[in-house]
Amino acid sequence: MKSGEPVNSHDVTDEQWEGLAQVVPLRGRDAWPSAVGHRAMPEAETERRRRFVVLRINVFADAREVAETLMAGIPVLLDLTSAEGEVAKRVLDFSTGVVFGLASGMHRVDRNVFLLTPAGTEVNGLMESAAGVPGV
């Protein structure tokens, strides 16, 4: 075998590829994140976690939106201030069941205003937990 000839039919020399395609490195060796300091898109996760929905409930039929939003992993600020007493009680009972079923959290913000949070959501600075709060 002569010098510079391919070893087998699959081996080719640089001269044979010359002019066919330009090879451009995508990143330098030091541009790749290290395993220790790398987190996959932390900004996107943080941005998603900052979002919450305010739902002002007037009729019991609106309670379904509370459940669907919380099931999607989005915190809900449940405002029952404009609902009649019996409707507010039914919606609160329903929402409590949803929170329990999803292992979520419920926090009282004000009279007839509650923050419903998906599991794993940290909440700071609220008045008290909704558990044991007398009345609606």
Curated annotation (Swiss-Prot):
Keywords: Cell cycle, Cell division, Cytoplasm, Septation. The keyword Transferase does not apply. GO terms for biological process: division septum assembly; FtsZ-dependent cytokinesis. The keyword Oxidoreductase does not apply. It holds the Pfam family SepF. It is found in: Cytoplasm. Gene3D superfamilies: SepF-like protein. Its main location: cytoplasm. GO terms for cellular component: cytoplasm. InterPro entries: Cell_div_SepF, Cell_div_SepF/SepF-rel, SepF-like_sf. Cell division protein that is part of the divisome complex and is recruited early to the Z-ring. Probably stimulates Z-ring formation, perhaps through the cross-linking of FtsZ protofilaments. Its function overlaps with FtsA. Belongs to the SepF family. Homodimer. Interacts with FtsZ. This is Cell division protein SepF 3. It comes from Streptomyces coelicolor (strain ATCC BAA-471 / A3(2) / M145). The lineage of its organism: Bacteria, Bacillati, Actinomycetota, Actinomycetes, Kitasatosporales.
